[in-house]
A protein has these predicted regions:
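Short alpha-helix capping/helix-loop boundary micro-motifs
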Residues: 94-99
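Hot-dog-fold acyl-thioester-processing enzymes
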Residues: 2-90
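HotDog/MaoC-like acyl-thioester-processing domains
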Residues: 1-15, 103-154
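Alpha-helix capping at helix-to-loop junctions
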Residues: 78-82, 102, 118
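Short, surface-exposed secondary-structure edge patches
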Residues: 60, 100-101
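Short, low-complexity, polar/charged sequence segments that are solvent-exposed and flexible
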Residues: 44-47, 55, 91-92, 130-134, ...
Length: 154
């Protein structure tokens, strides 16, 4: 499935209730986790100490930070949709966000999306995107919720 191209509010609204798309699989490796730990100053051993995690963690491996998983949402969202004729895009908020299970280092994740709700607020398009970040080979998602974005159409 190719990237969904949206050129106006009406085109976006026509997809209400529909799956918008699925991103490519993305591997979450230890280098990415370490970079995130450095950026956020969160060096908890379950994320960065490979040897200790092998011995002491119930996963027998390090795991990605939950917020690292969340932070990959914009990258994967960009693989799914191209919204044209906008001045800017602003993150508005998150609702019903839940971490279902950790992403074990080396796992592959992808984003699955559906247009949950859409409103025209005096020319600003507020879209609510139901999302799941799936882990390859797992039934339960790593993360799910509703992400709200404001698209300022020209």
């Amino acid at each position: 499935m190719g990237k969904l191209v949206i050129n106006s509010y009406d085109e976006f609204a026509a997809h209400l209730g529909e799956e918008l798309g699925v991103s490519e699989w993305l591997q979450v490796d230890q280098d990415r986790i370490n970079l995130f730990a450095d950026a956020t100053l969160d060096h908890q051993w379950i994320h960065v100490d490979v040897e200790r995690a092998k011995k002491e963690s119930q996963y027998q491996s390090t795991i990605a930070h939950g917020y690292l998983t969340l932070s990959l949402l914009p990258y994967m969202w960009d693989q799914i949709i191209e919204v044209n004729n906008i001045k800017m895009l602003v993150n508005y908020g998150m609702d019903k966000m839940r971490f279902g299970q950790p992403v074990v280092t080396g796992s592959r994740i992808r984003l699955v999306t559906k247009l949950h709700n859409i409103q025209n607020l005096r020319g600003i398009c507020k879209s609510e995107i139901e999302f799941k970040i799936e882990i390859e080979g797992q039934r339960k998602p790593a993360l799910e919720g509703i992400a709200s974005f404001l698209y300022y159409f020209i």
